[in-house]
């Protein structure tokens, strides 16, 4: 990610600082007394596998179509090398979950290297760390195998290993190797596996369930890619909602996200057809999500299936007694997550290496059940799941998947939260600045998904509008408990939804921090625990603000949703110095992409005169003043 820069004087963004007694423009006075408690979970993440954000994205495994899974297995991403042919073999299952393999038929007169390549997910990022590769093979073979990472166009080798291996036609043998790499200049790299054709003439070998990992985040087995994980860690979010989203619901009952098919050894995970146009391996499964939360200090928000698929697919919604097995499935999932190792599913979790229960306190029942024909039945379905879960786990906080009162039971059970999703235009986001000012404080809100939408990349106008909306949320963070921008990640080469918070390609160092990413980072990193009263002679618009404190530190967040600069003074009694972080561009259409980085935040140290900070807020800008 791009680090903040420190400037003085005019600087890169033409920031003007002066110490004066008064200014014309927006004058704010922050109270140092009292205030409302602010949710400690306010800023966080929503994740589902969209835009290859999981497979091919933050999930560290790099071989595409690695288990030849799905209802129509094919050779996507695979190609033959030398005197051999490859095909999908459906007759040599590794397990019930991995029924197919890649068959290599070596010609009777073969010479030279014979094998196959895999192109990864639109490339393979070779970062210079040690790589780990494993696969399963079957067939009568004894000899050398060579694994290489090689430039697709250049032929340059970035890592390789040659080793002796034997296998038989009786059963599969698992092969695991490690090898050093040198950093590749781009992601146009192939994984290549070959044998000596002359010594293996006429052989037929089957291979399946390939795994290729570089160094992972926190060195977790089957873990995350560090570059993307580090970008998220830098936001200092407080929660992770998973596994969706539409991908939780599925297109029908069969393709819903099935928690019990995402746990344990990879050879026992069949994967499922995702809702965003591609197959999900589920290598990033329930435990991996929870390790992600643990390693990044995030509170899990576990979504559970609630009897409804997208657009009422697959004879859903399911109601009445027909819901019983699905309620039992959720209770089994929660026992797996929360149960003591003496319980059936707690014991299963322990057998997979996690003895202690996971720290899960928030569970969301369904996803967007107000849409696609789910509303009419949701009150019944929510109540059935709520009662069963609450009876078994009374300390869990349960979240409804909508705030639409016509879809919810009346009254809503005490302690339940509601979820509001908001994809909108910039102007509409700004109009919603005060939408939570007068809501019922007895019903907490989760803003599970929001962003400006329908443009290729986040731009300054949209990001400032999001900041205005977020300021409105933070002002009401006694009742708004959590909020997450969505979607979170995007592989530029395979995209189903834009804009996205963080985009990436497989080229090294190609993590694209958007303007919206910087807004999220600025707001999340600079958080108080108490929202302070701010008085002003000015009305909100085009400048919007919120102030908070934590101990002796104060945070004032501002957004200028307009083309004119604004003179601002902020008075905080007792404060003498601070730091001003500003994200701005005079062009509201300015954006960062895979070909340009136009907008990054700048920081400057500022001094106060008698507790008053004065500065110029640029056009189309978001700013955070931190004072102490």
From Swiss-Prot:
Extract the Pfam families matched here: Alpha-L-AF_C, ASD1_dom
Tell me where in or outside the cell this protein is found. Answer: Secreted
Task: Please name the pathway.
Answer: Glycan metabolism; L-arabinan degradation
EC annotation?
A: 3.2.1.55
Key words of the record:
Carbohydrate metabolism, Glycoprotein, Glycosidase, Hydrolase, Polysaccharide degradation, Secreted, Signal
SMART domains, per database record: Alpha-L-AF_C
Among the record's GO biological process terms, what is one?
A: L-arabinose metabolic process
Q: Which Gene3D superfamilies match?
A: Glycosidases, Golgi alpha-mannosidase II
Residues annotated as glycosylated: 36, 51, 74, 152, 164, 260, 359, 404, 493
Top-level EC class: hydrolase
State if Signal is listed as a keyword.
Answer: yes
What catalytic reaction does the record list? Answer: Hydrolysis of terminal non-reducing alpha-L-arabinofuranoside residues in alpha-L-arabinosides
GO terms assigned for molecular function: alpha-L-arabinofuranosidase activity
Query: What InterPro entries has UniProt attached to this entry?
Result: Alpha-L-AF_C, ASD1_cat, Glyco_hydro_b, Glycoside_hydrolase_SF, Glycosyl_Hydrolase_51
Function, as annotated, reads:
Alpha-L-arabinofuranosidase involved in the degradation of arabinoxylan, a major component of plant hemicellulose. Acts only on small linear 1,5-alpha-linked L-arabinofuranosyl oligosaccharides.
The UniProt family comment states: Belongs to the glycosyl hydrolase 51 family.
Instruction: Indicate what this protein is called per its UniProt record.
Output: Probable alpha-L-arabinofuranosidase A
What organism does the record attribute this protein to? Answer: Aspergillus terreus (strain NIH 2624 / FGSC A1156)
């Amino acid at each position: 990610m791009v680090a903040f820069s420190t400037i003085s004087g005019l600087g890169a963004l033409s920031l003007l600082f002066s110490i004066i007694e008064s200014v014309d423009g927006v004058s704010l006075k922050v109270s140092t007394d009292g205030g409302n408690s602010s949710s400690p979970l306010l800023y966080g993440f929503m994740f589902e596998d969209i835009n290859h954000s999981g497979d091919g994205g933050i999930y560290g495994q790099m071989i595409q179509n690695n288990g030849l899974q799905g209802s129509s297995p094919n050779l996507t991403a695979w190609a033959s090398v030398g005197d051999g042919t490859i095909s999908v073999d459906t007759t040599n299952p590794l397990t019930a979950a991995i029924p197919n393999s890649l068959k290599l038929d070596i010609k009777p007169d073969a010479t030279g290297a014979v094998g196959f390549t895999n192109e990864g997910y639109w490339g393979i990022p070779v970062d210079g760390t040690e790589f780990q590769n494993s696969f399963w093979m079957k067939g009568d073979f004894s000899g050398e195998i060579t694994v290489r990472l090689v430039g697709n166009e250049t032929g340059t080798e970035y890592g390789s290993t040659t080793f002796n291996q034997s296998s038989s036609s009786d059963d599969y043998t698992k092969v695991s190797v490690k090898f050093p790499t040198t950093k590749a200049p781009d992601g146009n790299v192939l994984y290549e596996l070959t044998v000596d054709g002359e010594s293996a003439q006429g052989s037929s070998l089957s291979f399946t369930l390939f795994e290729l990992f570089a160094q992972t985040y926190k060195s977790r087995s089957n873990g995350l890619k560090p570059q993307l994980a580090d970008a998220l860690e830098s936001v200092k979010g407080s929660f992770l909602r998973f596994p969706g989203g539409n991908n939780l619901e599925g297109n029908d009952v069969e393709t819903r996200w099935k928690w019990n098919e995402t746990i344990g050894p990879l050879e026992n995970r069949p994967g499922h057809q995702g809702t965003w146009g591609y197959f999900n391996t589920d290598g990033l499964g329930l435990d991996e999500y929870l390790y992600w939360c643990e390693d990044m200090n995030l509170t899990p928000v576990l979504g559970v299936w609630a009897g409804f698929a997208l657009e009422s697919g697959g004879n859903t919604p399911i109601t009445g007694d027909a819901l019983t097995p699905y309620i039992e499935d959720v209770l089994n999932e929660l026992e797996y997550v929360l149960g003591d190792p003496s319980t059936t599913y707690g014991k299963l979790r322990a057998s997979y290496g996690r003895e202690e229960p996971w720290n899960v306190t928030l569970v969301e029942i369904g996803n967007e059940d107000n849409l696609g024909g789910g509303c009419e039945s949701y009150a019944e379905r929510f109540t059935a799941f709520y009662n069963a879960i609450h009876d078994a786990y009374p300390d869990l906080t349960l979240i409804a998947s909508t705030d639409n009162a016509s879809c919810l039971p009346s009254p809503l059970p005490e302690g339940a939260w509601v979820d509001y999703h908001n994809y909108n235009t910039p102007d509409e986001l700004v109009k919603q600045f005060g939408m939570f000012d007068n809501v019922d404080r007895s019903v907490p809100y989760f803003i599970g998904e929001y962003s400006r939408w329908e443009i290729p990349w986040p731009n300054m106008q949209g990001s400032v509008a999001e900041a205005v909306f977020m300021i409105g949320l933070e002002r009401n963070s006694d009742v708004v408990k959590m909020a997450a921008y969505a979607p979170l990640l995007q592989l530029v080469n395979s995209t189903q939804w834009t804009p996205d918070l963080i985009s990436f390609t497989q080229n090294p160092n190609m993590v694209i921090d958007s303007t919206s990413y910087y807004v999220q980072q600025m707001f999340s990193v600079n958080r108080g625990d108490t929202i302070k009263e701010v008085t002003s002679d000015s009305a909100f618009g085009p400048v919007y603000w919120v102030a908070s404190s934590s101990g002796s530190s104060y945070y004032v967040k501002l957004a200028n949703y307009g083309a004119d600069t604004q003179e601002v003074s902020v008075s905080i009694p007792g404060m003498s110095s601070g730091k001003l972080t500003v994200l701005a561009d005079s062009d509201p259409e300015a954006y960062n992409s895979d070909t340009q980085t136009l907008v990054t935040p700048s920081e400057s140290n500022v001094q106060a005169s008698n507790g008053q900070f004065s500065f110029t807020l640029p056009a189309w800008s978001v700013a955070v003043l931190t004072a102490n």
